[in-house]
Amino acid sequence: MTLTSNHEVGDADGNHVYRRITLRLIPFIFICYLFNYLDRVNVGFAKLQMLDALSFSETVYGLGAGIFFIGYVLCGLPSNLALNRFGPRRWIGLMMITWGIFSTCLLFVTTPVEFYVLRFLTGMAEAGFFPGIVLYLSRWYPNQRRGRIMALFMSAIPVSGLLGGPFSGWILNHFAAGQGGMAGWQWMFLIQGLPTVALGVLAFFLLCDKVEDARWLTPEQRQRVKTDITHDELNRPVQGKSSVASVLTMPFIWVLGFIYFCIQSGVYAINFWLPSIIKNLGFSDALVIGWISAVPYLMAGVFMLLVGRSADLRNERRWHLVVPMLMGATGLIIAANFATVPLIAILGLTIATMGALTSLP
């Protein structure tokens, strides 16, 4: 059974409604995701001072950076069940307050175990945020509009690198003298963690759990969105119920999982080690490292938006994923093989960042 909809992506009324939704929701969600990603990967910049200050080895850092994802994986499903139970507004706000506190507490770390525990807890707290936001946006945007919105939302990743790199470098330099009895890396965790707590509090007031609660839309506009979403649901291919066991026996699930694993491996190799790689190219000043690290993220942000728009206009997804993935792999190969030539290595890292991050939406 299908429902014929007269609401096409190009109609003026629909564009007005969804533009209004976008202006209301996306700026706040964008800022939340920016700090989500910054709190997750700012250890890459903290590493420039933290390892020497605490006598941590590269192994300790690598394990601490990676143990985040154990907590992330373990709590992903429970967190999204809780989101459905308590509603996006309350659960997203609570998640942000919690991981903001854990991320800020990294400034108190003195031993590897403390580092591991806080990174693990941060991963647990962040687990439901991204999938929760994806689910949340699916309640506001029909499928035909969602590609561009997801690209806009996820452009917070390169923006976090674009702004976070120079900002982190400035913090490390500015507080290098130990103002307030804290080192630069400690100030960085404090300055970048506390805003997340504040954003979590704001989420309770700025987000709506569902379209029906959006009093800033007229009744006609709310009905328009509900009709578009219903049209999507009724035209979705009907599939029988599947158990967890039956899903895990599907080969394509494992193939998709492997593809996603490869994408994320490239993304986080860049996020966690880009500052150190740039330092090893001969740049020692933290602010200079921050500005250089911003270049790949600037290019990735532009490329991500262009690819997201192209995918929607052409209603094509496969090649809009394959090409960025190939770019990411090519860029990493270039960077690895020209590690002693700074200009070419940075070019390779830029291509890798453009491809890897654009593969995510």
Task: Tell where the protein language model's regions lie, with residue ranges.
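Glycine-rich segments within core transmembrane alpha-helices of 12-TM secondary carriers
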Residues: 148-173, 195-196
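Conserved MFS/SLC helix-loop-helix module at the cytosolic interface between two early adjacent transmembrane helices
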Residues: 74-113
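Hydrophobic core of transmembrane alpha-helices in multi-pass small-molecule transporters
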Residues: 102, 114-128, 343-361
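Helix-to-loop junctions at the C-terminal end of transmembrane segments
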Residues: 75-88, 302-316
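Helix-breaking motifs and short loop linkers at transmembrane-helix boundaries and internal kinks
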Residues: 55, 78, 87, 108-114, ...
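C-terminal transmembrane helical hairpin of 12-TM major facilitator-type secondary transporters
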Residues: 317-361
